[in-house]
Curated annotation (Swiss-Prot):
UniProt keyword terms in alphabetical order: Disulfide bond, Phospholipase A2 inhibitor, Secreted, Signal
Family of this protein: Belongs to the CNF-like-inhibitor family.
Signal peptide bounds: 1-19
Pfam family, one: PLA2_inh
UniProt cross-references to InterPro entries, sorted A to Z: CNF-like_PLA2_Inhibitor, LY6_UPA_recep-like, PLipase_A2-inh_b-type, PLipase_A2_inh_N, Snake_toxin-like_sf
Gene Ontology molecular functions: phospholipase A2 inhibitor activity
Name of the molecule in the record: Phospholipase A2 inhibitor gamma subunit B
Length: 200
């Protein structure tokens, strides 16, 4: 259950001026309808995203809608890999006003395992700021080593830690502090370039 909660958080806060109203919802699957909520003063667009959690042979998809900032709309695809058998990825789309009523939801392309020759330390700690690291093979656009440490949890969550390969887009999103959760909790995020895999 805690693992699924972590995965939800990964997706739920993948999207964060003017005061506009955006639909808010999170559902398993692809059809998401919810309530209207006024966005924050720095949020000037609505964001819909589809997130997939893959751990062969299982794959879980959920869709969410929330407020966001237009300067992150071009960062429409992100992925992370904290474990050689686990992949987290998301596709995002922005809209405003009536456009949100007709804009088709983002759709993730079929996942293809594509090792890119890079590696990072990876692990997940669901109840601690520390976790036991091991080397993870990066895939596709994952060229960064991402570390997330949740020190001061909110929403009644325990401490958490996450390390693994990540796409540069995901690191740029964190750099822009797009994640609403960062505003209410003490979260350390660090990205460094992934390193070439050593020959065995």
């Amino acid at each position: 259950m805690k693992f699924l909660l972590f995965c939800c958080l990964f997706g739920t806060f993948l999207a964060t001026g003017m005061c506009i109203d955006c639909e808010h919802c999170v559902v398993w699957g692809q059809n998401c309808t919810g309530w209207k909520e006024t966005c924050g003063e720095n949020e000037d667009t609505c964001v819909t995203y589809q997130t997939e959690v893959i751990r062969p042979p299982l794959s879980i998809t959920f869709t969410a809608k929330t407020c966001g900032t237009s300067d992150t709309c071009h960062l429409d695809y992100v992925e992370a890999n904290p474990h050689n058998e686990l992949t987290l990825r998301a596709k995002r789309a922005c809209c405003t006003g009536d456009e949100c009523q007709t804009l088709p939801p983002p759709v993730l392309e079929p996942q293809v395992n594509r090792p890119n020759g890079l590696q990072c330390p990876g692990c997940i700690g669901l109840t601690s700021t520390e976790c036991n690291e091991y080397l993870v093979s990066c895939q596709g656009s994952e060229n960064q080593c991402l570390t997330i440490i949740l020190k001061k949890p909110d929403f009644s969550l325990s401490e958490m830690s996450f390390k693994g390969c990540a796409s540069e887009n995901l690191c740029l999103l964190f750099e822009k502090k797009f994640w609403r959760f960062l505003e209410a909790s003490e979260v350390d995020v660090k990205c460094t370039p992934a390193v070439p895999q050593t020959s065995q």
